[in-house]
């Protein structure tokens, strides 16, 4: 809680707004943590004028909150949020791609990364040019020999797979430095959005608004 943050002269007034990045010092009360001190390093006030960029931002915050747990170091998630909000303000990258990148990287940060480098069944590393499939139920890629009775496997192209591999391994500083074709973006959306929905137990209100606005 930020006590008195709504007062015009409160030192916490700016810090209580969404999309404010900084260092927050808290003290533990009887039933909650209270804000004691804050040092703001960046205000993303320009995001408020971005449509539908701001709704992407709200969704990213809600998804991060879903995975956040009290007492757990969430530094990686916080830094991911920071570079992601900056990416929303970059006119050279599609917000739809930003969403795909954030969702998959967040899943990886939470230990829910799908198997993208080896067949999830036989653990064999695919060779270049090999036909591969992505299974939501099996949480990763399958080669043709391991399809068996898997009924949800969808073919995944080499560019889409490479993009997903890059997303889960790149440093945060280089995470939003690539683009893809519209065809590959559609494929990433199909695989990643479905994977998120299958591995979370919540219907995100901000996502519902985003889908209406987009």
Q: PLM features: residue spans?
A:
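Non-catalytic alpha-helical scaffolds and adjoining flexible linkers that form interface surfaces
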Residues: 1-214
């Amino acid at each position: 809680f930020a006590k008195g943050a709504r007062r015009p002269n409160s030192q916490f007034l700016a810090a209580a707004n969404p999309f404010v990045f900084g260092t927050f010092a808290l003290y533990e009360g009887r039933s909650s943590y209270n804000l004691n001190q804050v040092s703001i390093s960046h205000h993303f006030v320009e995001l408020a004028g971005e449509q539908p960029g701001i709704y992407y931002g709200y969704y990213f915050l809600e998804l991060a909150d879903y995975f956040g747990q009290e007492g757990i170091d969430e530094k990686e998630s916080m830094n991911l949020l920071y570079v992601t909000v900056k990416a929303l303000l970059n006119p050279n990258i599609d917000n739809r791609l930003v969403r795909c990148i954030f969702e998959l990287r967040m899943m990886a940060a939470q230990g829910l990364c799908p198997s993208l480098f080896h067949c999830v069944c036989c653990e064999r590393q695919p060779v270049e040019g090999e036909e591969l499939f992505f299974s939501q139920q099996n949480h990763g890629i399958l080669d043709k020999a391991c399809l068996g009775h898997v009924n949800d496997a969808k073919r995944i192209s080499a560019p889409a797979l490479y993009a997903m591999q890059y997303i889960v391994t790149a440093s945060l500083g280089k995470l939003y430095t690539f683009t893809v074709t519209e065809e590959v973006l559609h494929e990433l959306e199909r695989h990643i959005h479905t994977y998120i929905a299958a591995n979370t137990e919540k219907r995100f209100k901000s996502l519902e608004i985003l889908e209406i606005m987009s």
